[in-house]
């Protein structure tokens, strides 16, 4: 769809989305109940920046309690300002608040606005005014090439939905886990399609790409920088059959997935050195260098040259360790961020957001 759009937009409801669609523990949701997930908004900003070919808006920004989530708390003071500036730091042309005035009737009468139902100022209005004043005095935010390209493929999303092979194994969650780990290392991320040019990015991450065209494989193999390919990649034909030869079938790395199993949430497979494989695990055959070994001795990931293949759905600890090691080897600067702190690089400034 994005090929035919002049501009893209999305609706940003950090507190509502934390409650009804972010996959996280109750402890995490309690800790960020009044702030939102520190990565969820940024992920969608980065995604729709690419869908809109650089031009995108926040069409609806949450200004207070909503009416549709399981629980609808008020944001902490300052969060409307933070969410607004975070959107601009990721390239938004506009942030529109939903809504102007809280309706005193009908099914959305409990949904907050910039004004109360009696037309008096609601708390969010002062923060929106503050952002407007700051924008007037600020430099224009000019985007720059991020260190990392994260490849996102809607066809793969459809394939995962048709054959997830296990409850809760969704392509979006796999992509998001990788994005969260990268951001936790202080990295800025461009979310690109498999057809976009990623040749100038320092690191390319490509998890869960069931179908990989010959052109994509060739472009990945010719990169000078590191490439991390994730589980299930290259396992399917374009028409959604099992690939022969078996996946991932990548140039420059000798690894074959011979069997796949999916795991209950309460039976993760521990990795040597920390972290685990959860949900999706592959049996790998290779003559190349092991990159990660499971605690039971089985192979979990393989690396040779600039290409690393992860043969399982790594948890956050395992992904963070892997990306940290790969970045240090490639001399890509990382900063392990404290919980809730994130940053975004632009051409002139580094933005820091404290959730």
Please give the residue ranges for each predicted region.
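A conserved amphipathic helix/loop scaffold
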Residues: 76, 207-355
